[in-house]
């Protein structure tokens, strides 16, 4: 659009393409509700005021007009549906822009995976921007499927204007110790005036200062107000996260006040489709924040203009002249139930349903089988007893953090076995990319599983397969079924597969609809409950067991990882440990 074309409409000399009458505008600049008409020309807002002529006129009868919602940080792969299906899921909930870090598929398929996300969403009515994965692999403590070097990034950034910056820099020891490759990636992007996203849970003081000196300007890993206050005070945009497992919204809402609100944004990070369909997306965060006493306009700002300004999306996040005509209509601001969604001035969703067709193109990459590993056998899972206590990974259903427990193991015939009565189950991390078996065995506490075994190919960040179980035989059945499917989620018991969800796209995403995936996830959860599982979303919890950049104790295919000290530790710790 040429500037000269919109000016006559803005001046009221020509009719608008779309005129919204009797609107109550949520003005994220003034912090006020403004009653006016809105004139729209092509894909832009031309003006706000007493406009009276439009080729199409919609009388809102006092309904609220809110900028299209923005998710400040997420991994589309965590929705377990294709990028197009993800768009079809979040658009009716008012999300018109997402800032995606595709480091999940990048760890499996490299830049080919990133390009797949970009190409598959061309022409889709969702503003999908990319933060180029910074940490592929995330650490040198596991095997993954690809590497992305600074040289790989140079041409990619020039080729794809949707790249906004560098994705979450997870291996903070590399940064504060001056790792040349990590710093070179930051230098490349910052000299192109791109943003650098952070990932630095629990780090404070001088190490935090050093990390921020590397031009890293955001963090989504805060789990308490004090941590968030320090990072905000040191210049970071705080991305408050509310996903399927990592739910920090309630804990961090007290952070928000009239002095610091511009530096707080909302994001989902990792959210399953059943949670999006049942709860909502960014709209859920707004509703919850308002319910907990946050001013409605402040909540809307965290989901719109704050994020747009941080990421230099200069024509997004507000209802104002010259801004993109991406907006949602809500009848009641406090309840924040979205009745209509407009993208580029076109009505695309009404009352939670799409009113347009969004076609999905098939891509050859969707057929690539990324599993090279052979089947496993029960003997591969054996752990000989040394007469010593062992380290156990303690997981929590509502957090991605883990703790290291030190416990006496249960033994049988000279081997350590799962102890259902004490909720100490065997866990294995198995390299999917290795043609020869490469795996590590550990033990996990906190799932409550009483029978059977569970396996998944979703395992941040390398996405090797993990399997936990009450017995080795069912672990073998579950793991081998995942291998045969080329990725997916599996529950087995008594030697049989009870439920499964194939994930053929990079072993991360399904080719089914969100509704079908949600239904299958619901069935998986039902089966898990029947087997005694106490974790709300075991597959999401299990997906973080291998994440060797978030404290405290993790497992990768190479061994148990002490994340604090960034090194491997033995399963055994001696009788006095």
UniProtKB/Swiss-Prot annotation:
Gene: ade
The keyword Signal is assigned to this record: no
Pfam entry (one): Amidohydro_1
GO biological process: one example: adenine catabolic process
Family: Belongs to the metallo-dependent hydrolases superfamily. Adenine deaminase family.
UniProt-listed InterPro entries: Adenine_deam, Adenine_deam_C, Amidohydro-rel, Metal-dep_hydrolase_composite, Metal_Hydrolase
Name listed for the protein in its UniProt record: Adenine deaminase
Organism for this UniProt entry: Kosmotoga olearia (strain ATCC BAA-1733 / DSM 21960 / TBF 19.5.1)
Gene3D superfamilies reported for this sequence: Metal-dependent hydrolases, Urease, subunit C, domain 1
Disulfide bridge map: none
């Amino acid at each position: 659009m040429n500037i000269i074309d919109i000016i006559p409409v803005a001046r009221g000399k020509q009719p608008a393409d779309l005129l919204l009458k009797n609107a109550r505008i949520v003005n994220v600049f003034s912090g006020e509700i403004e009653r006016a008409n809105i004139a729209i020309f092509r894909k832009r807002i031309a003006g706000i005021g007493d406009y009276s002529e439009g080729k199409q006129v919609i009388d809102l009868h006092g309904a609220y007009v809110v900028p299209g919602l923005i998710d400040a940080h997420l991994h589309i792969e965590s929705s377990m549906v294709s990028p197009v299906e993800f768009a079809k899921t979040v658009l009716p909930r008012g999300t018109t822009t997402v800032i995606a870090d595709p480091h999940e598929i990048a760890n499996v398929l490299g830049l080919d995976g990133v390009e797949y996300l970009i190409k598959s969403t061309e022409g889709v009515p969702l503003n999908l921007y990319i933060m180029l994965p910074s940490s592929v692999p995330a650490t040198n403590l596991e095997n993954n499927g690809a590497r992305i070097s600074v040289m790989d990034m140079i041409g990619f950034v020039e080729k794809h204007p949707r790249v906004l910056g560098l994705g979450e820099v997870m291996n903070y020891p590399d940064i504060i110790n001056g790792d040349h490759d990590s710093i070179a990636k930051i230098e490349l992007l910052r000299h192109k005036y791109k943003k650098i996203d952070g990932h630095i849970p629990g780090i404070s003081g001088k190490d935090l200062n050093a990390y921020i000196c590397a031009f890293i300007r955001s963090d989504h890993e805060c789990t308490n107000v004090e941590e968030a206050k320090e990072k905000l005070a040191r210049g970071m945009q705080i991305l408050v996260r509310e996903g399927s497992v990592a739910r920090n919204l309630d804990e961090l809402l007290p952070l928000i006040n009239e002095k610091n609100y511009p530096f707080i944004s909302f994001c989902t990070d990792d959210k399953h489709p059943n949670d999006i369909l049942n709860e909502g997306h960014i709209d859920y965060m707004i509703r919850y924040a308002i319910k907990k006493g946050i001013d409605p306009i402040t909540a809307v700002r965290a989901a719109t203009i704050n994020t747009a300004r941080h990421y230099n999306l200069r024509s997004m996040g507000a209802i104002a002249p010259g801004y993109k005509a991406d907006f949602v209509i809500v009848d009641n601001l406090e309840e924040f139930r979205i009745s209509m969604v407009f993208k580029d001035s076109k009505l695309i969703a009404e009352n939670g349903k799409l009113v347009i067709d969004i076609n999905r193109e098939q891509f050859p990459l969707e057929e690539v089988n990324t599993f090279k590993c052979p089947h496993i056998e029960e003997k591969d899972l054996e752990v000989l007893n040394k007469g010593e206590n062992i380290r156990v990974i303690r997981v929590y259903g509502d957090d991605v953090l883990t703790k290291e427990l030190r416990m006496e193991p249960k033994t049988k015939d000279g081997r350590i076995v799962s102890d259902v009565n004490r909720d100490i189950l065997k866990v294995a991390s198995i390299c999917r990319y290795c043609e020869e078996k490469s795996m590590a065995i550990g033990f996990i506490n906190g799932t409550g599983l009483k029978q059977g075994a569970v396996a998944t190919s979703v395992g941040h960040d390398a996405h090797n397969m993990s399997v936990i179980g009450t017995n080795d035989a069912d672990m073998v059945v579950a793991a081998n079924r995942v291998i045969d499917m080329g990725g997916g989620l599996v529950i087995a018991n008594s030697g049989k597969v009870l439920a499964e969800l194939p994930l053929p796209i990079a072993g991360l995403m399904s080719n089914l609809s969100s509704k079908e995936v949600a239904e299958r996830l619901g069935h998986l959860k039902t089966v898990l409950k029947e087997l005694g599982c106490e974790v709300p979303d075991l597959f999401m919890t299990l997906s973080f067991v291998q994440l060797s950049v978030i404290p405290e104790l993790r497992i990768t295919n190479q061994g148990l990882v002490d994340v604090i000290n960034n090194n491997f530790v033995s399963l055994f710790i001696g009788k006095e440990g």
